[in-house]
């Protein structure tokens, strides 16, 4: 399970973890710069994040896995499936569509991005290097504004994939999600009506009703 970026963390994925652990071994990891995971010293790339995920998988199992990712975590999931097809048997990607520079502009500004905001006071208690938080935001702005998730990536994904999104998602607009779905060879599409980016927090029952049968079919 791969959570969303910046404001995201494993606590947002609790409902998935609770449901999945009844039938599956669940591996939930915090990505670089989130929770107790270090930011690192090398430039941020989804290839690097995919290798992080593979390292965690290898530490737990040598079997192939199902990857469920949300937002930033879904883009990482796409890359894991592309680079390591033999290790990913299924994938659920939530809130992540086609992306090229210029389609959106990401800025981590405003009151919620005040380092003294209570949200960040709590998050910094977990961080190994809390003094790097603001620079991490600036680096992530640059990363998100230059990232590419295009036909070459999506057509390289061979595993069975469920592309899921909220109808009103402004981070990954509906048209971009449909484009991703159409480019992934073995994919299914689920759109949750009248929900936004964090669709599973608005209507988890509807999201789970799409995911559960997808996972249960061999």
Where are these regions (language model features)?
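Acidic catalytic loop of the alpha/beta-hydrolase fold
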Residues: 168-172
């Amino acid at each position: 399970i791969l959570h969303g970026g910046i404001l995201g963390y494993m606590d947002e994925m609790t409902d998935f973890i609770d449901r999945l652990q009844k039938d599956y071994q669940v591996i939930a990891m915090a990505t670089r710069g989130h929770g107790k995971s270090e930011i690192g010293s090398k430039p941020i790339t989804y290839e690097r994040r995919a290798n992080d995920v593979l390292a965690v998988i290898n530490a737990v199992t040598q079997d192939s896995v199902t990857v469920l990712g949300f937002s930033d975590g879904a883009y990482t999931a796409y890359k894991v499936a592309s680079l390591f097809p033999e290790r990913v048997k299924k994938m659920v990607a939530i809130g992540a569509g086609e992306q090229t520079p210029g389609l959106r502009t990401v800025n981590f500004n405003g009151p919620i991005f005040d380092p003294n905001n209570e949200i960040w006071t709590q998050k910094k208690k977990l961080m190994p290097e809390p003094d790097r938080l603001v620079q991490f935001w600036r680096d992530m702005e640059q990363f998100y504004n230059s990232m590419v998730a295009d036909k070459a990536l999506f057509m390289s994904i061979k595993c069975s994939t469920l592309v899921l999104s909220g109808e009103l998602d402004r981070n990954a607009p509906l048209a971009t999600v449909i484009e991703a779905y159409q480019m992934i060879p073995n994919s299914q599409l689920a759109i949750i009506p009248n929900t936004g980016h964090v669709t599973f927090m608005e209507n988890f029952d509807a999201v789970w009703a799409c995911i559960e049968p997808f996972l249960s079919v061999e």
